[in-house]
Structures are given as C-alpha cells and as structure tokens.
C-alpha cells in the first residue's frame, strides 16, 4: 500500500493548514488520486491493522438500503454511532440514495439494480454511475456523503471502479473506503461474470486532522507488507444475497492498530 503511504506523506509535508467544521483543524490538499490493481491483492492496509468486519458489514448495510444503525449494532459495528439520533436513524444517507433515490414524479430509483442491469446488457456504457449526493436531501442527512459518486468501466472482460470522494479523512476514513469499494468491485465483478480490474480513488479535500499528525508519522515509519487476498463464496450470484460469512480474508499480516480520535 505504498500509494496510501505516499498520500499520507504528501499531505503531511505539503498540505495547507485550515480550520474545519469540526473545530479540530486539518492539513489538506485539494485533488489527489490513487490507483490499485485488484488482481495484485486486496488493498487492505498492512501498516496498521484494520477491522475488516466493520468494513464488510457497513457495505452490506449500504446494499440493504438501510439507514438505521440497529442492524450494524446487532453485528458489533459501531462506526456510525456518533452521528445517529436517539432512535438510531441517520436520515436519507448512502443506502437510501443507492437503493431508493426519490424522483420528482414519485418513483424511487434503485441505482444499484440499474447499475447491474447496465453492466449485464450494455457494458460499454459510460453511464455506469451511482451517486449518493442528493442536494434536495443533504440537510436531512446526519452526515452528507463523503464518498459521493462512483463509476464503473468494463474493458477486456475486467471491471474497474473509480470513486470520487469530496471529503477524505485520510488517516481514519480513507483506508476503510479503499477496502470497501475494492470489495464492492469484486462482488459486482463476480455476479456479472467479469474479472476485476483497477480501483481508482479520486479525492477532493484530502485532509489529515491536526490530532492525527503523530499517528500518521508513526504509520509512515512502518514498512508495508504483502497485500492479503480475500476469498468470496463463488456460489453467490446475486449481489443482494451476500452475507458476512461469504468473505474470507487470507494471509493478512498487519502491524498493530494505531488509535486516533474521530472528528465529529
């Protein structure tokens, strides 16, 4: 994951110090891109241990169209707790926009199902896009979408994905986002009969919170290891039928976790 460490180093050494919504303060750059060849391994950080369980359950939760944290908490995942209201609701966040985008004529658009249909029937389309950025509903969301738009391309029998992330917490959030969208690409490739290509991660405001500087330096002092592999149950042919048990992480040798506070 040299590409990720290069990002950390670039922001730490070349970023601009700015104030932000949380009051913590950040060092940021505007516009940055990383590329990962998914045939070379699963892009899960080895320079600090990540909680893959949370990544998988969050992705399955998005795909369910759920926007309440109850299901996540049932499975021991707490990454959305800080933003939920007393009933566990988050408003019309990712899952709602992915699966039930409300149209002006009263319909609800299932962007994920539409995406799968287009990949299967018109793989050369340049419209293989899903967006979570709905301006009409931003104010109703507990947190506006950070990873807000992704696009797929099919070429030479391979499926590639590019994510645009408007706001990127590079120490805590970005490693999760890389793994999540890489896994989503692998899942969609499997159910559409394709091989995996690249995951391209394009960042808008790429920032390191001021209380993450020392943790970033600690991580940069570590040498990355060989990427792990992830085995997906080959019997699953429906994207919405995947369960946590359908994923097996292989050969993951990571250095110890590095704690850092979440900016809310």
Curated annotation (Swiss-Prot):
Pathway: Pyrimidine metabolism; dTTP biosynthesis
Enzyme Commission numbers on file: 2.1.1.45
GO CC annotation terms, alphabetical: cytosol
Top EC class of this enzyme: transferase
GO terms, molecular function: thymidylate synthase activity
InterPro entries: Thymidate_synth/dCMP_Mease, Thymidate_synth/dCMP_Mease_dom, Thymidate_synth/dCMP_Mease_sf, Thymidylate_synthase, Thymidylate_synthase_AS
HAMAP family: Thymidy_synth_bact
Family recorded in the similarity comment: Belongs to the thymidylate synthase family. Bacterial-type ThyA subfamily.
Assembly, per entry: Homodimer.
Protein role: Catalyzes the reductive methylation of 2'-deoxyuridine-5'-monophosphate (dUMP) to 2'-deoxythymidine-5'-monophosphate (dTMP) while utilizing 5,10-methylenetetrahydrofolate (mTHF) as the methyl donor and reductant in the reaction, yielding dihydrofolate (DHF) as a by-product. This enzymatic reaction provides an intracellular de novo source of dTMP, an essential precursor for DNA biosynthesis.
Protein name: Thymidylate synthase
Gene: thyA
């Amino acid at each position: 994951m040299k590409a990720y460490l290069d990002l950390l180093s670039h922001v730490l050494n070349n970023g601009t110090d700015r104030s932000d919504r949380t009051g913590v303060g950040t060092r940021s750059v505007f516009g940055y891109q990383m590329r990962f060849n998914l045939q070379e391994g699963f892009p899960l950080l080895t320079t600090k241990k990540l909680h893959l369980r949370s990544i998988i359950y969050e992705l399955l939760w998005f795909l369910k169209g759920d926007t309440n944290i109850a299901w996540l908490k049932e499975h021991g995942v707490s990454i959305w707790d800080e933003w939920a209201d007393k009933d566990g609701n988050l408003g019309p966040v990712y899952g709602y926009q992915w699966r039930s985008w409300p149209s002006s004529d009263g319909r609800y658009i299932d962007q994920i199902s539409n995406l799968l249909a287009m990949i299967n029937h018109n793989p050369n389309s340049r419209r293989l896009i899903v967006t979570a950025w709905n301006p009409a509903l931003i104010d109703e969301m507990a947190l506006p979408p950070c990873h807000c738009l992704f696009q797929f391309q099919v070429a030479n029998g391979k499926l590639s994905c590019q994510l645009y992330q408007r706001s990127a917490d590079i120490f805590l959030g970005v490693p999760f986002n890389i793994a999540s969208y890489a896994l989503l690409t692998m899942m969609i490739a499997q159910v559409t009969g394709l091989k995996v290509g690249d995951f391209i991660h394009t960042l808008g405001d790429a920032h390191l919170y001021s209380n993450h500087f020392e943790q970033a330096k600690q991580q940069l002092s570590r040498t990355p290891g060989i990427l792990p592999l992830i085995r997906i149950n080959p019997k699953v042919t429906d994207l919405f039928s995947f369960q946590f048990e359908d994923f097996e992480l292989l050969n993951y040798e990571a250095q110890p976790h590095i704690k850092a506070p979440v900016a809310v």
